[in-house]
Swiss-Prot record:
This is 2-isopropylmalate synthase. One of its GO terms (biological process) is L-leucine biosynthetic process. Gene3D superfamilies: 3.30.160.270, Aldolase class I. It is an enzyme of class 2 (transferase). The gene is leuA. GO terms for cellular component: cytoplasm. Residues 4-266 form the Pyruvate carboxyltransferase domain. Its cofactor is Mn(2+). It is found in: Cytoplasm. The keyword Lyase does not apply. The keyword Metal-binding applies. It catalyses: 3-methyl-2-oxobutanoate + acetyl-CoA + H2O = (2S)-2-isopropylmalate + CoA + H(+). Belongs to the alpha-IPM synthase/homocitrate synthase family. LeuA type 1 subfamily. Its EC number is 2.3.3.13.
Length: 506
């Protein structure tokens, strides 16, 4: 039975989702969780895009131990050398070089002839192979490329040293039958086919990204590319968790097994959702809140009698726990540390002490602490520690009618304290006005969302905000049991990002 490898591009293609703006620390958090998920290759970013991207890719490359770290690059020498500088410190570095091969791209975007494109592929892959142990070549817009020319381009890439060949459905145009036949065509038409691993990369514009990916596996693809939760530009990418579970459940049909630690799927999905601010739909396959819920009386009766009557996936397979309480206010530092290690978290003594203190404060107010609470707590404290400014005091009081007054005290990384007060039509507006006054910002609140992390009146709140100034938009989140505190944390998180961006472009 063949093993299917997964290439995750959440940190590159996924971050291109409108409104998603991850900082370096957040990208590193996701990368570490992808490593726990057992992802074979992670595309850490596009090193040549900006200095910020370069530094993020480099830090991930120098941190990850059990996965290949890859940077995207155009078929340009400067891009390829920049990618090398970013990932050369990785345990297993890889270059991902791409060039469009469809007539429409060659004519209108590249302004290149077929001969020019083939020459560029040869030169870029040859250079990449002189620097990297493995090189992946992507024929951008492959599904709208003339098949004979695509086969020619792929052959040139393999002969130049490409180890992996990606056949992307860049605009989500193809369907499963066409995609399957395309892989079969290449298998028959590319002389050096056996010398490379073939990969698929599907977009969801017509809602067929997962189906197309599975068809590619049938057609001979040994690597599947996509993102967690299917996030990405436009309608998104193939959701890797859906492809992986489909292969596992239907291995009888596909004769393939996913090389992924499936029990880490739920935790990975939740982390990506909270850091990006992209809410997972309740009815989403595998990771949606209703994925294992049964409303119909007939279905409920069947499940109670024999679970397989209506449930083809065991919730535990993907790490969907029953969320039973695991710790309480009497739990000690050792029990807390061991539980966090079990969940995959590692920290320095200083980080452990800070998170344990936050845990004890929560345990004093919340009777039962669940695994979901612990993950949220860790996420919130990590963001809190990485911020330029942290909230040290927050006070809100009623003025008149619907007017509220908020006093906010912030401390920066150097220990400087800033205090101001402001009024607003409600507590949230007053808090946000006060923070704006302290930071000297004039921005628009583009989005505000609040979610309950667990059930019950004492549940933690997760607040997501998006701030916009001109054409630049950033997001932030905050986690706390108190809604106002979570809201303030989220705003400070986003405002700090925005202030950094403004200072950078000045």
């Amino acid at each position: 039975m063949k093993q299917i490898l997964f290439m995750d591009t959440t940190l590159r293609d996924g971050e291109q989702s409108p409104g998603v703006n991850l900082n370096e620390q957040e990208k590193l958090q996701i990368a570490r969780q992808l490593e726990r998920l057992g992802i074979h290759v992670m595309e850490a970013g596009f090193a040549a895009a900006s200095e910020g991207d370069f530094q993020s890719v480099k830090r991930i490359a120098n941190t990850i131990q059990n996965a290949t770290v890859m940077s995207l690059a155009r078929a340009k020498e400067s891009d390829i050398r920049r990618a090398y500088e970013a990932v050369k410190g990785a345990v297993s570095p890889r270059l991902h070089v791409f060039l469009a091969t469809s007539d429409i791209h060659m004519k209108y975007k590249l302004c290149m002839s077929k001969e020019d494109v083939l020459d560029s592929i040869h030169r870029s892959v040859t250079l990449g192979k002189s620097l990297f142990p493995t090189v992946q070549f992507s024929a951008e817009d492959a599904t709208r490329t003339a098949r004979d020319f695509l086969a020619e381009a792929v052959e040139v890439a393999i002969r130049a040293g490409a180890n992996v060949i990606n056949i992307p459905d860049t605009v989500g145009y193809t369907n499963p039958e066409e995609y399957y036949s395309l892989f079969k065509y290449l298998q028959e038409s590319v002389p050096s086919y056996e010398k490379a691993i073939f990969s698929c990369h599907c977009h969801d514009d017509l809602g067929m990204a997962v189906a197309n990916s599975l068809a590619a596996v049938e057609g001979g693809a040994l690597q599947v590319e996509g993102t967690i939760n299917g996030i990405g530009e436009r309608a998104g990418n193939a959701a890797l968790e859906e492809v992986a579970v489909a292969l596992h459940i239907r291995k009888d049909f596909y004769q393939a097994e996913p090389s992924m630690t499936l029990k880490e799927i739920k935790a990975t999905s939740t982390l990506v959702s909270r850091l990006t601010g992209m809410v997972v739909p309740k009815n989403k396959a595998i990771v949606g809140a209703n994925a294992f819920a049964h409303e119909s009386g007939i279905h409920q009766d069947g499940v109670l009698k024999e679970v397989t009557t209506y449930e083809i996936i065991e919730p535990e397979l993907v790490g969907e726990s029953q969320n039973l309480f695991v710790l309480g206010k009497h739990s000690g530092r050792h029990a807390f540390t061991e539980k966090m290690k079990e969940l995959g978290y590692e920290f320095t003594t200083e980080e452990r002490d800070a998170v344990f203190e936050a845990f004890k404060k929560l345990a004093d107010r919340k009777k039962e602490i669940t695994e979901e609470d612990l993950r949220a707590l860790m996420l919130g404290e990590a963001a809190f520690a990485a911020q330029q400014y942290n909230i040290t005091q927050l006070q809100v009081h009623f003025v008149s009618n619907s007017t509220q007054c908020a006093t906010v005290v912030l401390k920066d990384e150097e220990g400087n304290v800033f205090e101001d007060a402001a009024t607003g039509s409600g507590s949230i507006e007053a808090i946000y006005n006060a923070i704006q006054r302290i930071l000297g910002l004039e921005c628009e609140l583009a989005d505000y969302r609040i979610q309950s992390i667990t059930q019950g009146q004492d549940a933690l709140a997760h607040v997501h905000v998006e701030l916009k100034e001109g054409t630049h938009q950033v997001s932030g989140f905050g986690v706390a049991q108190d809604v106002l505190e979570a809201s303030a944390r989220a705003y400070v998180h986003a405002a700090g990002k925005l202030k950094s961006f403004i200072q950078l472009v000045k």
